[in-house]
Structures are given as structure tokens and as C-alpha cells.
Curated annotation (Swiss-Prot):
This is Beta-secretase 1. One of its GO terms (molecular function) is protein serine/threonine kinase binding. Responsible for the proteolytic processing of the amyloid precursor protein (APP). Cleaves at the N-terminus of the A-beta peptide sequence, between residues 671 and 672 of APP, leads to the generation and extracellular release of beta-cleaved soluble APP, and a corresponding cell-associated C-terminal fragment which is later released by gamma-secretase. Cleaves CHL1. Induction: In brain oxidative stress induced by amyloid-beta deposition during aging increases protein levels. Residues 479-501 are cytoplasmic.
């Protein structure tokens, strides 16, 4: 989750996962309806096949299906740490940059990293503290040998934060014991001098500076059991597996190397433009974050989007708590009326000047199944679009429709339709383009920067103001002390007189 991670992840606000709670399910009758309107027309384009690059050829069979997890609790990969190797499940998080593992007993952990048992552990004698919007962890920094059994056949020495204390970080039943931050060093804790795991991997091996994620999500199977509540996917390290997507990959530039920041230039609900200043979509940033569950939107954008989604799905009446993510809606198993819900389209800046492409998100993505309250008679869902105070976050529910390529070498992120996304017979997720969009650079939000000279000027002005306030106070104190001295002398004289009497 960013360092300002929401409850990992799936918190809405930093990057953290949402806590599992008991929700009131709202039972709604099923009504028949037509499929949503067809997607808008796009401009003609030439074939957009990605170029082959060194390290992108070859087989990644051993990495396919190497992710596991539970709906709403994140995706994890198996890793080994230390000598002899200690096996741990590690949450995959593109919204933070620390590799951190539980290193002390915790009620929600079945196992943890025991540094004293590793002959290759090196203590850096430095602490680290990471707070989230809700939750936190702290620990001790060190290095050790790390490998990924269902990944590249290499072992690297990497920085590890051994988590010794935490609050609302680990999730009961999630089955992961640590977090693998895959973002850039700029947001690493305690500072950007701490090299993230993926940087160490690329530097110490010949693996190309690229990875890709296919998050497959969870739909309701016909024969539902607790075991089937899990989700899966693939993390391909060092390249692209063409079997994991259909169609072409479309790339958007990474605006800044801290989070995986991108620029959204337009938002549509069922083909209807929200018609907002595009800066609003990116206020104060837009990031791709596998460690957050929801699609999180800035306040104004969220309100406009919900208004449009409500209007499009008006054949059913939903409680206000549903749109706030506080209540669930349930239908009889297998009868969810997907067709009454609109698609959401996000237009992303393309690599070519004045061109964008759009990713189309289905209701099967933004209505998240909640298995722990569903019965064999009901399918229950949570609205997985929420309000954000830290910009737009394209979380796991968005990524579950697409194969997402984090091409760090070329500073770009690619999107293609995932071969495993959940859809119905009427609509599928889509990645389409190009579309002509002018002045896209203006859509990025620039955080105001104050130079040192301005700060010094402000400091001098504040000091002068303080001095002006302090001067009268000092004069008053001096005057009071003088009067007190005079009064004290007078009191002594009076006492002497009384004695004489």
C-alpha cells in the first residue's frame, strides 16, 4: 500500500486492505433487462502489436498461476528468505516500496521470519516505521538472501524490514505474512536510500527491468464452498506472457517514478462523459496499485460517477449505504442482473502525442463478491468504488479485468484484456484506441513546489512577527517585576513599623 497506504489495501486511503466486517445484506428482486448500450466508436488505427524486446521471449510457464489470495484481501506470492530457506506468503503491492515480513509472533500469523535461524541475515542496525491511514507497522532493517520458487531461478540479497510490532496491518485468514513493495525507491521507508527488492533483483541478475500482473478475481461458482472463495493470478518477472491476454497491449507513460503514476484524461459511465476538468481526475495523483482493493476516486469525481451509475441502474433501488460501501446487496444465487449496471471507461494518456486509449471496466469488477456472508441461496456484493483524499487509485478490482505490464525500463504501463477476467455473454472488458485527445499534459496535477529562498523569506517574516508580539510582552514583564520589587520594599518597611509599635 503507499507508504500512505490505506489499510493495505484494501483500505481506502493508503493502500491498506479493508477490514472484514459483518454487513447487512439487502435482498433485491431480479428484473429482466437488456444489455447495456454498445461501446462508443473509436478512430481507425494501425495494428498496435508490441515490439519484442530482449528478455521478453521465452517461456514463463513456471510463473503462471503463482499468485493466490482471497477476495478483498490481496494477492500473494510464495517467497523464501534466509539460509536455510524459510517459506512465507508475501502480498504483492505495486503501491509501496518496502519488502517487509512478520518477524514476531502475531495472532493472525501461522508462521513468521525467524532471523536468528538464518546464517545469512545481516542486521543494518536501523529501525523503520510505516503508518497508514488506518494501521501501522514498525520493525528493524536488515538484509538476507531471497528467492521466489515459482519465479526466476535466482537468489538475491535484498533489504528486509523485520516487522516486530503492528496494528491493523495483518488480516485474519488472509494467509500472507509480509508485503512486497514493487514501486520505486522515492517512497521507500525510512528514506529513498533503501533499495527496493525489484531494484536489487535487476541489479544483481540479468533479468530485464519489467514485470507483469494478471489478477483473476473471484466470481461466484455454481458449487460454492469456502475453498472456492480464493482468487488466483500470475506475476511474470522479467517479461510478458502472451498467453495471459487477448488483443493488443496499449501503453501509457509513467508520469513520475515514485508510485506507478499515470494520467487519466477522461471518464465515462456507459459512454456518457462526466465532462469534468481532467485535472480533477488526477488530483493529486492517479496510480496503479495492486495493494488497494477498490477503484478510489477524488471526492468530486466520485460524487459525479456515483450519480451517473445510480441513474443508469435506476431500475433497481439501492440503499445509500450500498453506494458508500457500508451495505451489501444480495440476489438469489446465479441471478445477479449485471445488465442493469453500466460500464465505467477510463481514458489514459497514450504514448503518441494527442492520442489516448480507454479501458472499459465491467460491473463484474466494481461489484466485489463477498463470500463470507453469502449462502448457497444468495450472491452478495459490495460496491468497490470509493472516495479518496489522495487521488485516483486503480486498485485490484480494476486490474482484475486486465493484464497489466509494468515496463520500468521504458517508463510505461501496458494494459490488455485479461484472458481470465469475469464477464457475461453481453459484455467483456475492453482496451481500445486510439482516440484524439488534445492538451493531455495539462491533465496532470502538479503539486506546488516552494523553493528554499521563498521558505527563508517566510521564516524571516514569521520571526519578525513573533518579535513584534514578544516585545510588548517583555516590557509588561519588566514593568511587573519592577512594581513587585517596589511593593516588596514597601511591605518590609510596614512590617518594621509594626514591630516598633
Amino acid at each position: 500500500m503507499a507508504p500512505a497506504l490505506h489499510w493495505l489495501l484494501l483500505w481506502v486511503g493508503s493502500g491498506m486492505l479493508p477490514a472484514q466486517g459483518t454487513h447487512l445484506g439487502i435482498r433485491l428482486p431480479l428484473r429482466s433487462g437488456l444489455a447495456g448500450p454498445p461501446l462508443g466508436l473509436r478512430l481507425p488505427r494501425e495494428t498496435d502489436e508490441e515490439s519484442e524486446e530482449p528478455g521478453r521471449r521465452g517461456s514463463f510457464v513456471e510463473m503462471v498461476d503463482n499468485l493466490r489470495g482471497k477476495s478483498g484481501q490481496g494477492y500473494y506470492v510464495e517467497m523464501t528468505v534466509g539460509s536455510p530457506p524459510q517459506t512465507l506468503n508475501i502480498l504483492v503491492d505495486t503501491g509501496s516500496s518496502n519488502f517487509a515480513v512478520g518477524a514476531a509472533p502475531h495472532p493472525f500469523l501461522h508462521r513468521y521470519y525467524q532471523r536468528q535461524l538464518s546464517s545469512t541475515y545481516r542486521d543494518l542496525r536501523k529501525g523503520v516505521y510505516v503508518p497508514y491511514t488506518q494501521g501501522k507497522w514498525e520493525g528493524e532493517l536488515g538484509t538476507d538472501l531471497v528467492s521466489i520458487p515459482h519465479g526466476p531461478n535466482v537468489t538475491v540479497r535484498a533489504n528486509i524490514a523485520a516487522i516486530t510490532e503492528s496494528d491493523k496491518f495483518f488480516i485474519n485468514g488472509s494467509n500472507w505474512e509480509g508485503i512486497l513493495g514493487l514501486a520505486y525507491a522515492e517512497i521507500a521507508r525510512p528514506d529513498d536510500s533503501l533499495e527496493p527488492f525489484f531494484d536489487s533483483l535487476v541489479k544483481q541478475t540479468h533479468i530485464p527491468n519489467i514485470f507483469s500482473l494478471q489478477l483473476c478475481g473471484a466470481g461466484f461458482p455454481l458449487n460454492q464452498t469456502e475453498a472456492l472463495a480464493s482468487v488466483g493470478g500470475s506475476m511474470i518477472i522479467g517479461g510478458i506472457d502472451h498467453s495471459l491476454y487477448t488483443g493488443s497491449l496499449w501503453y501509457t507513460p509513467i508520469r513520475r517514478e515514485w508510485y506507478y503514476e499515470v494520467i487519466i484524461v477522461r471518464v465515462e459511465i456507459n459512454g456518457q462523459d462526466l465532462k469534468m476538468d481532467c485535472k480533477e481526475y488526477n488530483y493529486d495523483k492517479s496510480i496503479v496499485d495492486s495493494g488497494t482493493t477498490n477503484l478510489r476516486l477524488p471526492k468530486k469525481v466520485f460524487e459525479a460517477a456515483v450519480k451517473s451509475i445510480k441513474a443508469a441502474s435506476s431500475t433497481e433501488k439501492f440503499p445509500d449505504g450500498f453506494w458508500l460501501g457500508e451495505q451489501l446487496v444480495c440476489w438469489q444465487a446465479g441471478t445477479t442482473p449485471w445488465n442493469i449496471f453500466p460500464v465505467i471507461s477510463l481514458y489514459l494518456m497514450g504514448e503518441v502525442t494527442n492520442q489516448s486509449f480507454r479501458i472499459t471496466i465491467l460491473p463484474q469488477q466494481y461489484l466485489r463478491p463477498v463470500e463470507d456472508v453469502a449462502t448457497s441461496q444468495d450472491d452478495c456484493y459490495k460496491f468497490a468504488v470509493s472516495q479518496s483524499s489522495t487521488g485516483t487509485v486503480m486498485g485490484a478490482v480494476i486490474m482484475e479485468g486486465f493484464y497489466v505490464v509494468f515496463d520500468r525500463a521504458r517508463k510505461r504501463i501496458g494494459f490488455a484484456v485479461s484472458a481470465c477476467h469475469v464477464h457475461d455473454e453481453f459484455r467483456t472488458a475492453a482496451v481500445e484506441g486510439p482516440f484524439v485527445t488534445a492538451d493531455m499534459e495539462d491533465c496532470g496535477y502538479n503539486i506546488p513546489q516552494t523553493d528554499e529562498s521563498t521558505l527563508m523569506t517566510i521564516a524571516y517574516v514569521m520571526a519578525a512577527i513573533c518579535a513584534l508580539f514578544m516585545l510588548p510582552l517583555c516590557l509588561m514583564v519588566c514593568q511587573w517585576r519592577c512594581l513587585r520589587c517596589l511593593r516588596h520594599q514597601h511591605d518590609d518597611f510596614a512590617d518594621d513599623i509594626s514591630l516598633l509599635k
